Amino acid sequence: MSNEFINFEKISRESWKTLHQKAKALLTQEELKSITSLNDNISINDVIDIYLPLINLIQVYKIAQENLSFSKSLFLKKDIQLRPFIIGISGSVAVGKSTTSRLLQLLLSRTHPNSQVELVTTDGFLYPNQFLIEQGLLNRKGFPESYNMELLLDFLDSIKNGQTAFAPVYSHDIYDIIPNQKQSFNNPDFLIVEGINVFQNQQNNRLYMSDYFDFSIYIDADSSHIETWYIERFLSILKLAKRDPHNYYAQYAQLPRSEAIAFARNVWKNVNLENLEKFIEPTRNRAELILHKSADHKIDEIYLKK
């Protein structure tokens, strides 16, 4: 174990799955398929072995958060205010963050049927393409400087204080922020925040996004495996884009397969891999839990902060 993981307890899949006794997955195969991202691979057994114990662990943290909030209120002689439980999920492009986020949202909704469970992605806090072009940053999209961190931190602050908050909406089909469209959040019980940058402290030194998190997860994998998944996903996106001339990726959809693969590999090497190695992976040890994936997308190791 490297020094980076010295403060984590390594748990094998076999050991982890014994931490939950229920054999029921809480969702159907059809529901699981509907929330699984392109070229991701997850089974009902993965839900039972990995995610049901994870739901148990999140409940442990939520109870601890509520107890601490109660004790603080007594100490300060103030009325008790239950705040939203915020979960941050980070990891590389194409590693499976979206699948994990949607699955957790569904499972938390099933295990807490009277609770409001919401999901937001930090893609919505990217600057619009026009602004990135004007600043000469379009080729740096996804890097720290391409996010409106002040807006994102203000959003999280509003959520944490029980206020109604609004998030911009990003479309991968148009590769841009959707003008005049907002996603509203009205004091949810749980909020899942998913994005490559959720543990970073970009342009603002006041605080980290993770200061607002009650629990946090990093999805990890060998970069060579993620490269393969990224290229496979890119090819799948091109197939879909052929049917929609307005899709951003339609301009690449007619490329011969070999050229499309070469293009995707170049983007991976010069954009996504650089971003991963310089800005995303170095934040890994800020997570409470690291889920490591093997080449077949299966989670084989779990690291829990001590």
UniProtKB/Swiss-Prot annotation:
Q: Where does ATP bind?
A: G91, S92, V93, A94, V95, G96, K97, S98
Q: What is its EC number?
A: 2.7.1.33
Any Pfam family = PRK
Q: Where in the cell is it found?
A: Cytoplasm
Give a GO biological-process term: coenzyme A biosynthetic process
An example Gene Ontology CC term for this record: cytoplasm
Catalysed conversion reaction = (R)-pantothenate + ATP = (R)-4'-phosphopantothenate + ADP + H(+)
Q: Which SUPFAM superfamilies did the record assign?
A: P-loop containing nucleoside triphosphate hydrolases (SSF52540)
Kindly list the GO molecular function terms attached to this UniProt entry: ATP binding; pantothenate kinase activity
Write out the pathway annotation from the protein's UniProt entry. Answer: Cofactor biosynthesis; coenzyme A biosynthesis; CoA from (R)-pantothenate: step 1/5
Domain of life per record: Bacteria
Keywords carried by this UniProt record: ATP-binding, Coenzyme A biosynthesis, Cytoplasm, Kinase, Nucleotide-binding, Transferase
Describe the family membership recorded for this protein in Swiss-Prot or TrEMBL.
Answer: Belongs to the prokaryotic pantothenate kinase family.
Q: What is this protein called?
A: Pantothenate kinase
Q: Which organism is it from?
A: Streptococcus pyogenes serotype M5 (strain Manfredo)
Gene that produces this protein = coaA
